[in-house]
A protein has these predicted regions:
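C-terminal and inter-domain tail/linker signature
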Residues: 1-106
């Protein structure tokens, strides 16, 4: 997540694209959609979305896996089964957050 955050904070979409699968997707639950997060498909679109929205997030463990915590109450859950990130789920709906274990490293 350090590389994702560094690239997002600097607005380096090329660096973000290098971390993403070419067919990566970004999905938004209803709570995130109400906050203006829109779905994206393809590394360039997902990179732009992350650069625009994840720059102020901080690293977190979401259900034990690397993710991001964004204020006020949203999480980014990444799927990278064997290499590049294939999907990003942005969750902000309280019903989707209530059953998640979120830990912010010190």
């Amino acid at each position: 997540m350090d590389a994702v955050l560094a690239a997002a904070r600097s607005g380096d979409t090329a660096a973000l694209r290098s971390l993403l699968d070419p067919d990566a997707v970004l999905r938004a639950d209803p709570g995130a959609a109400r906050r203006g997060v829109r779905p994206a498909h393809g590394a360039p679109a997902v990179a732009r979305a992350l650069a625009a929205r994840a720059a102020t997030a901080r690293p977190a463990l979401v259900d034990g896996a690397p993710g991001l915590l964004a204020a006020p109450s949203a999480i980014y859950v990444f799927t990278a089964p064997a290499g590049p990130i294939t999907s990003v789920d942005v969750l902000a709906d309280p019903s989707h957050l209530s059953h998640r274990t979120i830990a912010v490293p010190a």
